[in-house]
Amino acid sequence: CGILGLGGVGHMGVKAFGLHVTVISSSDKFVVDVAASNLDK
């Protein structure tokens, strides 16, 4: 299973499926957003 995009619906999908998340981003701000969403980094 894969989810492209972690904003809005993507974030809800990750939580609903209890998926392992790998985040690839050039922005440190995005990593902070993931941490604030109670998702594993």
From Swiss-Prot:
Keyword ATP-binding: no
Family: Belongs to the zinc-containing alcohol dehydrogenase family.
Keyword Zinc among UniProt keywords: yes
Top EC class for this record: oxidoreductase
Cofactor(s) required, per the database record: Zn(2+)
Keywords: Lignin biosynthesis, Metal-binding, NADP, Oxidoreductase, Zinc
Protein's UniProt name: Probable cinnamyl alcohol dehydrogenase 2
Pathways per UniProt: Aromatic compound metabolism; phenylpropanoid biosynthesis
Extent of the signal sequence: none
Gene Ontology biological process terms, A to Z: lignin biosynthetic process
Organism: Pseudotsuga menziesii (Douglas-fir)
Phylogenetic classification of the source organism: Eukaryota, Viridiplantae, Streptophyta, Embryophyta, Tracheophyta
Assigned EC number: 1.1.1.195
Molecular-function annotations in GO: cinnamyl-alcohol dehydrogenase activity; coniferyl-alcohol dehydrogenase activity; metal ion binding
Function, as annotated: Involved in lignin biosynthesis. Catalyzes the final step specific for the production of lignin monomers, like coniferyl alcohol, sinapyl alcohol and 4-coumaryl alcohol.
Gene3D superfamilies, alphabetized: NAD(P)-binding Rossmann-like Domain
Record text on cofactor binding: Binds 2 Zn(2+) ions per subunit.
Catalytic activity line of the entry: (E)-cinnamyl alcohol + NADP(+) = (E)-cinnamaldehyde + NADPH + H(+); (E)-coniferol + NADP(+) = (E)-coniferaldehyde + NADPH + H(+); (E)-sinapyl alcohol + NADP(+) = (E)-sinapaldehyde + NADPH + H(+); (E)-4-coumaroyl alcohol + NADP(+) = (E)-4-coumaraldehyde + NADPH + H(+)
